[in-house]
A protein has these predicted regions:
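Conserved short-loop catalytic and cofactor-binding motifs
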Residues: 73, 192, 245
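Intrinsically disordered, low-complexity segments enriched in polar/charged residues with Gly/Pro
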Residues: 86-89, 96, 159-164, 225-229
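Sensory/regulatory domains in signal-transduction proteins
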Residues: 96, 103-110, 115, 125-214
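Short, charged low-complexity intrinsically disordered segments located at boundaries
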Residues: 115-119, 173-177, 235-241
């Protein structure tokens, strides 16, 4: 009898088991030798260990009171792009079993929206509005690590440094000020393994690019502020951002990201 051909799911599970073993050894010995551990993850593990993050911690730290959270939301530089981000990413997440988090440049989660039952589960590990998910505070995780290295990041299950987070996968992309290039926040999608897919990364990058372009164009006010956004990125050299009967062509840099 011929052996059953390997499936993608089998490969992912095999890699996950190898990463889990590597994580156990790293926590015990402080060294990574397994090739199954991606370099971006190994480097993040080392930073997490150097910062004294406890891999056995049960929950992230809540650092913002309700009043502080409201003030942080008002002062975050990209707040004007929130309606677009909701339309392109957060509202669809509620129907797809995912959670979307928007954080500031310090890794504090200012908005966490999406699937209601999944949000309740995420809150038990401290993935909630007002919590601090910087890499220095919470170890290897997509939003924190994306901010730490200023680059899109996908973290799968046992690649997380803290054990309590290892049932989750996530994709995060930093947000930049279009005028200065400075990091001003991060957008993250959290859920099962499907959120660490190439498609999920494309969707988050597209949303960030559209948000940055929106900031460059200036705030939208008046009746059109509630009009839904739509982003077209396929089959064209430059991505188009639609709102009602108005179409805005994204910059070449943002289109290249998509």
């Amino acid at each position: 009898m011929e052996p059953r051909p390997a499936r993608l799911g089998d490969d992912l599970r095999r890699v996950a088991r190898a990463v889990a073993r590597a994580h156990e050894r790293f926590v015990a010995q402080g060294q990574v030798t397994e090739s199954a551990v991606r370099s971006v993850v190994a480097e993040s593990w080392r930073r997490s260990l150097d910062r004294g993050v406890d891999p056995g911690r049960e929950s992230a730290q809540l650092v913002l009171s309700a009043t502080d959270l409201a003030e942080a939301r008002e002062s975050v530089p990209w707040a004007a792009a929130l309606p677009m981000i909701r339309s392109l990413l957060m509202e669809p997440a509620a129907d797809s079993g995912h959670v979307v988090a928007l954080g500031d440049a310090d890794g504090r989660l200012l908005w966490v929206e999406g699937d209601r039952s999944l949000r309740s589960s995420a809150e038990r590990m401290g993935f909630a509005e007002g919590a601090l998910w910087s890499e220095d505070a919470a170890g290897t995780n997509a939003p924190g690590t994306a901010l730490a290295i200023d680059s899109p990041v996908q973290i799968r299950t046992h690649e997380h440094f803290v054990g309590a987070v290892q049932n989750w996968s996530c994709t995060a992309v930093p947000v930049h000020d279009p005028a200065t290039g400075q990091v001003i926040g991060v957008i993250d999608v959290t859920g099962d393994d499907s959120v660490a897919s190439p498609l999920a990364l494309t969707m988050v990058r597209a949303t960030v690019a559209a948000g940055e372009q929106s900031l460059a164009l200036g705030p939208r006010t008046g009746p059109r502020a509630a009009t839904p956004w739509r982003l077209d990125v396929l089959g064209r050299d430059r991505a188009d951002l639609h709102r009602g009967d108005t179409t805005t062509r994204l910059s070449a840099r943002h289109s290249e990201l998509l």
